[in-house]
């Protein structure tokens, strides 16, 4: 998880062996992935951020084409393509041209092609960027299902992507790891840093904004409730310590505009 420009795509390309690290190593079962070479790539599935497919191909024909590139025999490729098209919810439109697909449907074709070789590791670079809320929810549910049997490495700047599917999160900024852990571990680290403050008017909002970072503003009939974060304890009379959310963590480390895509 990280804002645009944090280095997520670079990292995904390195894990997929498409880009060599300038220093350090990436290990799989204790061995450098670049020395494992084809033995490593044979167990990896990859969906790049800018995935596209031949638009005149049908979804099934495209998967059969990718299967041929992977060296699969026709019968195996056909059986696998049908199975995956059912998994991603595209079996009923398998013979439809990809040019007629929505962005979310194309991403699901991308997931299917990445799963053709039964990968042990599935690498997904910003897979939900640009999708509408319904397609994004469908995509997250699909990832939860796939993740039962496959290691899924997902990069995103969208908080809701990882809140519902990730077992562990690495937050990066400017190519550096800021923190790493389970959701509970990361949220526990934010305890005592998130507060609710109720004010009466806009001038009080501005006063709070000058002192603390505001995560959200909820305007009610009689008052305005501010959700704020602070590294130090807030002793204002109207401040109430509340349980942290992942949005608070993101706001604590990154800018507001990166956290508002939901």
Where are these regions (language model features)?
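Conserved ABC ATPase "signature" region
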Residues: 64, 68, 75-93
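Conserved ABC transporter NBD signature motif
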Residues: 24-35, 39-40
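Conserved ABC ATPase signature
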Residues: 97-101
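Helix-to-loop junction immediately C-terminal to a conserved catalytic motif
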Residues: 16
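A short, proline-enriched helix->beta-strand linker immediately N-terminal to the Walker B motif
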Residues: 116-120
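ABC transporter nucleotide-binding domain
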Residues: 138-227
């Amino acid at each position: 998880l990280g804002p645009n420009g944090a280095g997520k795509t670079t990292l995904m390309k390195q894990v997929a062996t498409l880009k060599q690290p300038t220093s350090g190593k990436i290990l799989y079962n204790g061995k450098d992935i670049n020395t494992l070479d084809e033995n490593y790539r044979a167990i990896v599935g990859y969906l790049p951020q800018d995935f596209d497919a031949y638009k005149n191909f049908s979804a099934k024909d495209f998967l059969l084409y990718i299967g041929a590139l992977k060296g699969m025999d026709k019968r195996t490729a056909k059986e696998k393509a049908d199975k995956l098209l059912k998994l991603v919810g595209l079996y009923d439109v398998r013979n439809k041209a990809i040019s007629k697909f929505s962005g979310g449907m194309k991403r699901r074709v991308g997931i299917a092609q990445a799963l053709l070789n039964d990968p042990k590791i599935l690498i997904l670079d910003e897979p939900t960027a640009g999708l509408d809320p319904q397609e994004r929810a469908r995509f997250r549910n699909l990832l939860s299902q796939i993740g039962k049997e496959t290691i899924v490495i997902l990069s995103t700047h969208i908080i809701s992507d990882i809140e519902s599917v990730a077992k562990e999160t690495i937050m990066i900024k400017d190519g550096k790891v800021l923190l790493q852990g389970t959701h509970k571990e990361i949220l526990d680290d934010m305890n005592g840093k998130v507060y609710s403050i109720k004010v009466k008017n806009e001038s009080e909002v501005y006063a709070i904004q000058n002192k603390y970072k505001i995560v959200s503003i909820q305007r009610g009939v009689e008052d305005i409730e501010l959700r704020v974060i602070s590294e130090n304890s807030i002793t204002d009379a109207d401040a109430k310590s509340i349980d942290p959310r992942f949005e608070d963590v993101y706001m604590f480390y990154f800018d507001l505009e990166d956290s508002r895509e939901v």
